Amino acid sequence: MINQKKIRLSGDKSISHRALMLSSISSGASQLSNLCDGADVQSTIDCLKACGAKIYKSEKSYTVNSSSLSNPNNPLNCRNSGTTMRLLTGLLAGQRIKAVLYGDTSLSKRPMDRIIEPLKKMGANLDYINNQIVLKKSSIRGGKISNPTPSAQVKSSIILAGLNGEAGTVLTESYSTRDHTEKMILKQNDNSKWEILVFSYDFKSGE
């Protein structure tokens, strides 16, 4: 016999990363409830704080106060979080931030060229040196970008970089990936005239 109990599940990790990053560049205060409380999301919180975002934790939610980010004083430690490193690189490139991002031994073995190359094509000034992403102040142009990798992390990095691009960004992906980032951006900007154009040719689960 199974006893009935109430179980509170932690929030979705992928959505938690994106909610924190988008709130960090939004005007006014954002209140986020039921965030994932895992180590990867904490890495994103710590990196955003280092870039000037004001993030406060209460018993049931987080409050994010920030309208602009600033250059961090020290390299950003993404620890073991590939989502933090890949998405944050795109976000910071679009915000014209200068930063160095690195991770632990495991993260250092994961491929980063999949974001480096498309971001460079968009105008980002960055390199991958000794397992660190070295990002200089960039002017994102936008343009037509192709993503052959079935990864929502790569797609999201491109979209986040393109938010402040000089021109629009049209992204073509070989495989359809999860659309958390697109939906959240449009939801946070209900009254805007933004459009997010992503053309997909097939379906394959992304990250």
Please give the residue ranges for each predicted region.
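Structural preference for solvent-exposed beta-strand-turn elements
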Residues: 1-207
